[in-house]
Design a protein with these regions (language model features):
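Residue-level signal for short hydrophobic patches within transmembrane helices
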Residues: 17-36, 40, 65-72, 150, ...
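Transmembrane helical elements of multi-pass membrane transporters/channels
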Residues: 22-41, 147, 181, 210-214, ...
Length: 471
């Protein structure tokens, strides 16, 4: 027997701005802390003189492969979160419970399959993501990838359960579980890298230990859920529930997996056109473009973690109010969300354009050549010049997913990352060389925003019409 407590009814009555703060802030912190796993690794790796830009480049190679795991996890977690929120809004508690059970099973099975694939085809996968730029980068990539792969099941489980915990009405616990894992990683990284001199292995092992801690927090919470209380371990997969849950989460998956495709294209174009450059064509500097773009992406990841945290934190609020047919509240939330996201983008833009050298210094620029710093300044100022539009686009993707417009959200996300992102990453270097890779992101964001603006206007109009989609 499972039952619904009255504690979630405030989602339909409390002030929207207060709900946004209550749900978005813990989600932002959770995502920021989650992002810190890889970012902290890269900071310590970059500042270790015996690793330097080779280690940074290796981190850039492996990073997209962890995003594949994240893509599957957030598809299950965000899809389940949206499903549960809408089901609870309609008081369909049985469906909510089944969705959680199925998400748990799918996260465990998919993580084990992905781990096996990574271990079997490691060298081929590393080469696909540009790891053959030079011998040192390839060697560091192999070492880092192997140990990171061992933590994939724990990483995926923790990430999948995080939005489910938020949907159960406990965003603070979701935040704490992620914080605990990241804190462990931050403490262990300098010990393993600088004291024990374990290099890339040390960075990876510190990350995995933190991920294990987060996964154990998630397991504990599943046994003590607040709103949905399972009485028995019925984890049989149900086609209808899984289908709807995966449909709601497919945008999160495609948003992440298409980013992987874009990063693969970018890494390979950096390798190809870097080899044709007078400076970066030299063996000792070949890894610099990849290392630098990896750093720029880490800054972008921090900003997008805030943006996605705001929007994803609002999924339970949107889902509940859509289920309860309170569309004017959803419209109000959408307005406030877009304004907040644009402000975040504006702050990020000022930082990227005005203080690139200070940002680069965090990632060990003092240990590198002048070529490294010069290219990094150019990369920050060019690659991130349309941050405001990028933030609004991302908010639009997730909001559409939250209101049940999975197809529209998916298509918009795919256009941004695959059609525009991958397309321009492959096309522009043909005309502009290495700089063309840097132009690909702002051009993609401008074109995507044109489509987003049209959809935003249409969505506003629809939120004035009575009626609601069924779960």
């Amino acid at each position: 027997m499972i039952f619904l407590e009255t504690g979630n009814q405030f989602l339909g009555t409390e002030r929207v701005s207060k709900l946004m703060r209550q749900y978005a802030i813990p989600c932002i912190i959770s995502l920021l802390v989650g992002a810190l796993y890889n970012i902290v690794d890269q900071i310590f790796i970059a500042n270790a003189s015996y690793l330097g830009s080779y280690g940074n480049a290796a981190n850039t190679v492996v990073f997209p492969l962890t995003v594949v795991a994240l893509a599957i996890a957030v598809m299950l977690g965000d899809g389940c979160c949206a499903f549960v929120s809408m089901a609870l809004g309609r008081n369909e508690v049985d469906k909510a419970k089944q969705s959680v059970d199925n998400a748990v099973v799918l996260s465990v099975v998919s993580s084990l399959v992905l781990t096996a694939v990574y271990l079997i085809f490691a060298n081929t996968i590393i080469a696909m993501f540009g790891g053959t730029v030079n011998e040192e980068t390839f060697r560091h990539s192999q070492e880092y990838f192997f140990y990171i792969t061992l933590g994939i099941p724990f990483y995926m489980f923790g990430q999948a359960m995080n939005p489910i915990i938020r949907a159960d009405g406990n965003p603070k616990f979701a935040m704490i579980s992620t914080l605990a894992g990241a804190a462990i990683n931050i403490i262990l990284d300098p010990i393993f890298i600088f004291v024990f001199k374990w290099g890339m292995m040390g960075a990876a092992v510190a990350t995995v230990i933190g991920q294990v801690a987060t996964a154990f927090f998630a397991v504990w919470y599943l046994l003590h859920m607040k709103i949905i209380k399972p009485a028995s371990g019925d984890y049989a997969l149900r086609g209808t529930v899984c289908g709807r849950m995966l449909t709601l989460g497919i945008t999160s998956f495609l948003s992440q997996i298409s980013l992987v495709a874009a990063m693969a294209a970018i890494n390979n174009m950096l390798r190809k056109y870097g080899a044709l450059d007078a400076v970066f064509g030299q063996e000792q500097y070949a890894q610099i473009p990849m290392a630098v773009v990896g750093i720029v992406m880490k800054f972008f990841q921090i900003v997008i973690s805030i943006v996605v945290g705001m929007a994803a934190g609002c999924i339970p609020i949107v889902g509940y109010n859509m289920g309860a047919e309170k569309k004017l509240r959803v419209r109000e939330l959408f307005t406030k969300l877009l304004i907040a996201e644009a402000l975040v983008g504006a702050v990020a833009l000022v930082m990227a354009e005005g203080f690139p050298r200070q940002l680069i210094a965090i990632f060990g620029a003092a240990n590198e050549s002048g070529y490294y710093t010069d290219f990094a300044v150019k990369a920050f100022r060019t690659y991130l010049c349309m941050m405001v539009l990028a933030c609004v686009n991302k908010a639009c993707f997730i909001f559409l997913q939250a209101v049940g417009k999975a197809l529209t959200s998916t298509l918009l996300s795919m256009f941004r990352e695959v059609v525009f992102g991958v397309g321009f990453a492959l096309l522009l270097p043909v005309f502009f060389g290495l700089d063309g890779v840097l132009y690909s992101m702002p051009v993609s964001d401008i074109l995507t925003f044109i489509i987003s603006a049209i959809i935003i206007v249409k969505t506003y109009r629809e939120l004035n019409v009575e009626g609601v989609q069924k779960v």
